[in-house]
């Protein structure tokens, strides 16, 4: 992905969150120079992977397969002390797919915080980590039990949420013609290095072409300032 594209997508989420009256912390707009001047007082942000994350999952087509995320709070994977939860906010565009995956340990609530409608496709997993293409899926939607066939699609309107247990395959996208979606995630500690299982082997983070100076720092870049 080009740096200019990444910066534009970060700005899009900043603007969208503001329009949906979802204020974000001041550090989300810090420049690279501000980050370089900031010392150990911000180590929780650095060590716990808080911050910006823009990916096309190696597709080369962000509008079709991609996601813009901001991790607002998280614990440190593998630590017995500290926060044992995570919160993210995401901008999911119409028809923009986050590919099918599950988490080995993380349970998460996916929340439609405003905008359009979020479509989530669900499958159970087998013992060898494949799709269970026959088994009925059971989830809780805002505390109400729901049953779907394998590969069934759950549509969340603004204000609705679904609890996804570990090892439940899910893909999601914004419903076409309904507008982008501001999506929240509340979960156990997030560990992108070890806890993700994508159905198809995909790069989690993109290679970046530095076509212009960066305006924002991604959560993977703090050690390179």
Language-model features: where?
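A short beta-loop-beta micro-motif enriched in histidine and acidic residues
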Residues: 77-86, 97-109, 113-114
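Conserved metal-binding segment of the jelly-roll/cupin
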Residues: 93, 150-177, 183-188
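Double-stranded beta-helix
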Residues: 127-146, 173-225
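Short helix/loop capping segments that flank catalytic or ligand/cofactor-binding pockets
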Residues: 100, 121, 172-173, 194
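A short, N-terminal "cap"/entry segment at the start of jelly-roll beta-barrel domains
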Residues: 1-86, 215-221
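Glycine- and acidic-residue-biased ligand/ion/polar-headgroup-sensing regions
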Residues: 93-94, 106-108, 112-128, 133-135
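His/acidic/aromatic-lined binding-pocket segments of jelly-roll/cupin-type domains
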Residues: 88-90, 108-112, 119, 153-154, ...
């Amino acid at each position: 992905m080009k740096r200019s594209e990444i910066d534009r997508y970060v700005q899009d989420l900043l603007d969208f969150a503001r329009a949906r009256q979802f204020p974000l912390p001041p550090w989300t707009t810090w420049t690279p120079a501000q980050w370089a001047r900031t010392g150990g007082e911000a180590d929780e942000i650095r060590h716990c992977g808080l911050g910006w994350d823009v990916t096309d999952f190696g597709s080369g087509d962000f509008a079709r397969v991609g996601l813009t995320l901001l991790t607002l709070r998280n614990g440190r994977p593998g630590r017995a002390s500290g926060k044992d939860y995570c919160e993210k906010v995401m901008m999911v565009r119409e028809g923009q797919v986050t590919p099918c995956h599950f988490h080995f340990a993380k349970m998460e609530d996916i929340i439609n915080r405003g905008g359009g409608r979020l479509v989530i496709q669900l499958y159970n997993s087998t013992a060898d980590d494949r799709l269970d293409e026959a088994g009925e899926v059971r989830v809780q939607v805002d505390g109400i039990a729901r049953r779907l066939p394998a590969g069934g699609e759950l549509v969340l309107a603004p204000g609705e949420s679904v609890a996804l247990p570990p090892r439940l395959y899910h893909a999601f996208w914004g419903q076409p013609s309904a507008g982008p979606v501001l999506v929240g995630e509340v979960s156990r500690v997030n560990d992108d290095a070890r806890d993700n299982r994508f159905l198809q082997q995909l790069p989690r983070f993109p290679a970046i072409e530095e076509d212009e100076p960066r305006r924002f720092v991604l959560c993977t870049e703090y050690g390179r300032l």
